[in-house]
């Protein structure tokens, strides 16, 4: 989805900005507890189950269900997600306040960011499925 959204924005001549740089992404990965990563790899037999649950929640537009399916991933810790969500909020806020902006984030960030943006005075609604008809997944 990220790559397709990037292609659409480029094709339409839109300005594209990243909400974090490579070093910040690497720092997030470094913060993953090693045992959590090991447990995830040992649990590879359940990955098809997680994928199916994630797909079902995604297609149903079930944000809580979608967030629940990502908790198995090593990077889905409160510290990692919370720190990144605050960074995303700070960096997207000026553009959202200026208007005519779109911010794309992974599903693990949707619940926190929705609450944060509502605290900032934004009305947050589900995206119209028509947007996703342009994206080939």
Model-flagged regions — what are they?
Residues 100-137:
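C-terminal structured interaction module
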């Amino acid at each position: 989805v990220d790559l397709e959204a990037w292609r659409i924005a480029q094709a339409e001549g839109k300005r594209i900005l990243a909400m974090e740089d490579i070093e910040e992404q690497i720092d997030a990965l470094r913060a993953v507890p090693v045992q959590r990563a090991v447990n995830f790899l040992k649990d590879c037999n359940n990955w098809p189950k997680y994928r199916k649950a994630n797909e079902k929640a995604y297609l149903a537009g079930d944000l809580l269900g979608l967030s629940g399916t990502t908790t198995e991933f090593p990077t889905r810790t409160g510290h990692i997600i919370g720190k990144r969500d605050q960074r995303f909020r700070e960096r997207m806020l000026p553009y959202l306040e200026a208007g005519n902006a779109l911010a794309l984030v992974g599903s693990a960030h949707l619940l926190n960011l929705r609450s944060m943006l509502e605290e900032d005075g934004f009305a947050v609604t589900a995206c119209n499925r028509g947007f996703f008809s342009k994206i080939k997944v």
